[in-house]
Amino acid sequence: MKLTSFENDNENVLHSYIFSQQAKPHAAIDALFSALLPFGKPFIVQPGEEFSLYTEQSTRIVLLESGIFSICRSDRGLNVLSVFAPSLAGLIDSYGVTYDVPTRPEHFLIAETECRGRAVSLADFIKVTDECNLWHDVARFLAYRLMVMNVRDRELVGVDSYLKVRALLIEIAAYNDEDR
């Protein structure tokens, strides 16, 4: 039986940030934005400001039109993922609310740059997605997000500190000058 070593796995794969930009399902995002933007409430969030996915009335789906934000866990503030426009956020939290998942994960957003977008109520999101038959596009976006998380985990889980710092430096170097 041959054992495969994964020690240098990071040497032979595309970095998660570069992968996330190249694999982004633009057609699915465009279809979702086209149908949902008219139902969203516009927002602008400045760098360092938090944006809640929850209001007293509803959970919100965020359509990020410009900027970069971090998705953070509400319980510990742990940064889960950085998201670059165009993108969506709030699908996981909305699923938890819709299906009353006990001890569901909750998240909030922190703007890394000025962020502009629209916040769509969960009720409007479900209604429009049903009426416009957009669930395939939602599934494509969620599959994309899972792939990005998988690639990112390969860089961060089970590796030494050097490889984690190296992955972060590669990511920062790949950013556009204005985002860096």
List each model region and its residues.
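Glycine- and acidic-residue-biased ligand/ion/polar-headgroup-sensing regions
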Residues: 59-77, 84-87
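Residue-level marker for the onset of beta-strands and adjacent loop->beta junctions
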Residues: 39-41, 67, 79, 105
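Short loop/turn microsegments at loop-to-beta-strand junctions
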Residues: 40, 58-59
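Short phosphate-coordinating micro-motif centered on Lys-Gly-acidic
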Residues: 50-57
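Cyclic nucleotide-binding regulatory module and flanking cytosolic helices
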Residues: 1-49, 87-89, 94-99
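Cyclic-nucleotide recognition modules
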Residues: 80-141
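Short beta-strand segments in beta-sandwich/barrel cores
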Residues: 41, 50, 67-73, 116-117
